[in-house]
C-alpha cells in the first residue's frame, strides 16, 4: 500500500514500518525515494550513520493525515481490475497484514476466495509468511488441489510480494508471472 500511496499522493519519499525480511520478533523500516525505488544497502548504511551520530539537518516539514486511505487503495484495485470470469482462489497470508485486504479485494473483483491463514497473528504459528518459503508454498499447493481452485496466492508478511500456484498445485515462477502481467496490463481490452 505504501508504494501505491507514493504514486497516488505524489510523494517524494516513503517509509514503511515492516518486518518483511526480518526474523520474527524484529521490525525495521523500509524507506524509499523516487517512485517505486527503495533505498539500497549503501543508502541505508548512510541513514543509519546519520541517525546514530545525530548528523541531522534541521528543516521544516509537515504531516498530513489522510483518513481512510486503506479504502482508497482497495477501491482503486477493485475498480481497475474486474474479472471477466469467476475464479476460485486460495489466498494465503501467513497470518501477516495482507490478510487485512487481500481476501476482500479478491472477493470484490469476482473471485471465490478460500482463505488460508489470513487472521493476523504476529507469532506466525504455521509458517514464515514468505512466498519463497517451501512450507508456505506446499500449504497453498495442498489447499489449491483439495479445493479444486484455479489459482493460489501466497503473500509475504507485509503484502508487497506474492507467490503464485497454478490449478495443478505447481508454483508459477516470477519469470512467467512478469510477462503475463505485462501483457495483461499493456494490451487494450
Question: Can you name each region flagged by the protein language model?
Answer:
Residues 27-147:
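Gly/Ser/Thr-enriched, mixed-charge loops and adjacent short helices
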Residues 52, 56, 151-152, 157-169:
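Self-splicing inteins and homing endonuclease
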Residues 183-189:
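Conserved small/polar residues in nucleotide/adenosyl-binding loops
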Residues 1-35:
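Ferredoxin-reductase
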Amino acid at each position: 500500500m505504501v508504494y501505491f500511496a507514493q504514486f497516488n499522493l505524489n510523494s517524494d519519499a516513503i517509509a514503511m514500518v515492516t518486518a518483511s525480511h526480518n526474523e520474527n520478533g524484529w521490525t525495521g523500516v523500509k524507506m524509499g525515494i523516487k517512485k517505486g525505488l527503495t533505498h539500497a544497502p549503501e543508502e541505508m548504511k548512510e541513514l543509519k550513520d546519520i541517525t546514530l551520530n545525530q548528523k541531522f539537518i534541521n528543516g521544516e516539514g509537515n504531516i498530513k493525515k489522510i483518513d481512510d486511505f486503506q479504502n482508497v487503495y482497495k477501491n482503486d484495485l477493485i475498480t481497475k481490475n474486474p474479472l471477466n470470469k469467476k475464479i476460485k482462489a486460495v489466498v494465503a497470508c501467513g497470518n501477516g497484514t495482507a490478510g487485512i485486504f487481500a481476501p476482500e479485494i479478491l472477493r470484490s473483483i469476482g473471485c471465490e476466495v478460500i482463505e488460508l491463514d489470513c487472521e493476523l497473528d504476529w507469532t506466525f504459528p504455521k509458517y514464515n509468511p514468505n512466498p519463497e518459503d517451501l512450507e508456505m508454498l506446499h500449504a497453498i499447493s495442498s489447499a489449491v488441489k483439495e479445493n479444486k481452485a484455479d489459482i493460489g496466492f501466497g503473500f509475504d508478511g507485509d503484502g508487497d510480494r506474492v507467490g503464485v500456484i497454478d490449478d495443478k498445485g505447481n508454483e508459477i515462477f516470477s519469470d512467467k508471472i512478469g510477462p503475463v502481467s505485462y501483457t495483461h496490463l499493456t494490451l487494450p481490452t
